């Protein structure tokens, strides 16, 4: 088995394990990020869109075959889930913009129980210094991923969530 096929097999294995874990939202986010990173790396190495889309199709076809034993129960579970009947307004709940203070301050405001956004001053400083100091495409890609992920956590308080909800496949479930 050549390098390209072993990479495809590895991708299928990672995605299948994620799917079999039974947390559909996590699987979906891993699949989105893995696909985006594959496209990024492929475009950086000069691969054509046809080549990239062909490899993505192969990986997801093999993934469907490997995970088919769990696919029907998972679809049934999703159809019975209460989340599928929730209105957009309920699904679009997210952080409020004031929660950004939690990056550097704990025990602040209405969500002071968990501090889900806390990074700390050192962590935030190192993250912000990494991109300009390295200046390579990979740093810019991961900074973009972090920004998109952060904006999506604000749910309906930011327009990007609305776009993702209506455009990305299966994103409307979460």
Predicted regions and their residues:
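Periplasmic/ER-lumenal interhelical loops and adjacent helix-loop junctions
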Residues: 52-132, 162-174
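Perimembrane helix-loop-helix junctions
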Residues: 29-62, 134
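Short hydrophobic alpha-helices at membrane interfaces in multi-pass membrane enzymes
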Residues: 2-16, 47-58
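Hydrophobic, aromatic-rich transmembrane alpha-helices
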Residues: 119-140, 144-151
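Hydrophobic alpha-helical membrane segments of integral membrane proteins
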Residues: 6-11, 24-32, 144, 161
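Hydrophobic transmembrane alpha-helices
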Residues: 1-2, 14-18, 33-44, 128-129
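Membrane-interface helix caps and helix-loop-helix hairpins in membrane proteins
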Residues: 19-28, 110-111
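Membrane-interface alpha helices of multi-pass inner-membrane proteins
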Residues: 8-23, 59-66, 148, 152
